[in-house]
Amino acid sequence: MWGIVLLIVLLILFYLYWTNALNFNSLTESSPSLGQSSDSVELDENKQLNVKLNNGRVANLRIAHGDNKLSQVYIAEKPLSIDDIVKEGSNKVGTNSVFLGTVYDYGIKSPNAASTSSNVTMTRGAANFDIKEFKSMFIVFKGVTPTKTVEDNGMLRFEVDNMIVCLIDPNTAPLSEREVRELRKSNCTLVYTRNAAAQQVLLENNFTVINAEQTAYLKNYKSYREMN
């Protein structure tokens, strides 16, 4: 009896496989293993193939600007907890560099929701660097000395090694004309924000998106490239 049932099941499976209704590779194709990356191949406007690497949570960029200036910037491609920031900042982020992204208030508020602190800036000390929090964002200057130029409820801005680094509150009003002019006239400007209105204004003013998450924008630079 059970032998007949098993035979019928096998025949049905064979039929489904033969007609391509059953794909034994579907599980591995839709769920990459831990050793696989989520890289993608895209066709650009010039019909050339570009490989886009998405297997890391921190992008490492080298930006050329000014008179032979090179700035090293690390951008978190997803929100990180304070513990993650300390770990990435200690293990992956090199010296003489800037590290920024979105922070979670790990252990203070919910670890599953981004920070909503009303404080303009808060500084947390790590072993060999400080973590500055601005609204739901963070910035780390590792081995470089920044000069703070703007700090208000909507924007935090520094100058470091002839490059402007700016964080824009994701919940603030759209950028004013004065703010846009100030950002445009700067030498090299890196803006990090999740503010959709601000992102649109930056794109309209010819800022370039430089990370996969589309939260980092660059202007007045010579070139940039992602490092391994």
Swiss-Prot record:
Major localization listed first in the record, in broad terms: virion
Keywords: Host nucleus, Membrane, Virion
GO cellular component, one term: membrane
InterPro entries: Baculo_ODV-E25
Intracellular or extracellular location(s): Virion membrane; Host nucleus
Induction behaviour: A microRNA encoded by the virus, AcMNPV-miR-1, matches the E25 gene and down-regulates its mRNA expression which presumably favors occlusion-derived virions over budded virions.
Pfam families: Baculo_E25
Coiled-coil intervals: none
Function: Plays a role in the production of infectious budded virion (BV) and occlusion-derived virion (ODV) formation.
Protein family: Belongs to the baculoviridae p25 family.
Name of the featured protein: Virus envelope protein E25
Organism this protein belongs to: Autographa californica nuclear polyhedrosis virus
Gene, per the UniProt record: P25
